[in-house]
Amino acid sequence: MAPIIVPCLLLVVLVLQCSVINSLDYCSLCRGGRGEHVGCGSPGFSSDCGQKARTRKFTKEHKKVILDKINDVRDHVAKGSWGLPVASRMKVIVWDEELAALAKRHTQGCVPEAYKCRHTLRFWSPGQLNFEFYADKMPSTMSLISTAIKRGHTQKHNITRDIIEKYQPAGPKGNVKELALAISDRVTAVGCGLTTWKLGGKARALLTCNFSSENDYNRPVYKTGNSPGEKCIKKDETFKNLCSAQEPINPNEHNF
């Protein structure tokens, strides 16, 4: 019976996520002059989107590539690659449909500037990464995803131990924001959206990924240790330096 139960449990989780997305009044979440929530109001493309705007749907393969690439980087960092300290309790991240739905809504504005208010009832301070693309001809969805991942991966040359211990979005060698968010041990989930359009004779795209948490200035990106995953309850079978996806990490707690 076990092979049947597991998919059913996953289906229940997905249904609950979709129910939250469809029923939650995001307009009531923003207070204190933080502006309009990205999920507030009717969905649709803004006037900045030019012509032929459309939101691209991510297939299971697209989602798998995003998760595998991010988890592979987390796995490398957790074991102390690139001269960085070992991570004691960094988990495998999973796809979250609510974060993805809000990322999709953000891309429909066709501008990279992040909404100040994008939190949810489950994720109080989500991180966000935006990737802009300009080309004569629009590449495939998979190509856009790969390009974004490569951009973030190049920041391994910029990130340092000092940044891991006390986060800053940039160091002496350059920007580290994208990579630092992807390897935060407070991040438990990610969801992305993609919109493409034409403007000024050029093909344009905006890929946005929302993460369950964002890094706090001057606080650790992740907690270090003597050996990879030494504080995990159970390690992942594929990414052996990471905790399993079931590791009970609270994305709303701060690192100290």
Swiss-Prot record:
The keyword Transmembrane helix does not apply. Keywords: Allergen, Pyrrolidone carboxylic acid, Secreted, Signal. Gene3D superfamilies: CAP (3.40.33.10). One of its GO terms (cellular component) is extracellular region. The keyword Secreted applies. Expressed in salivary glands. InterPro entries: CAP_dom, CAP_sf, P14a_insect. Residues 67-211 form the SCP domain. CDD domains: CAP_euk. It is found in: Secreted. Residues 1-16 form the signal peptide. It holds the Pfam family CAP. The modification Pyrrolidone carboxylic acid is found at residue 17. Belongs to the CRISP family. This is Allergen Tab y 5.0101. It comes from Tabanus yao.
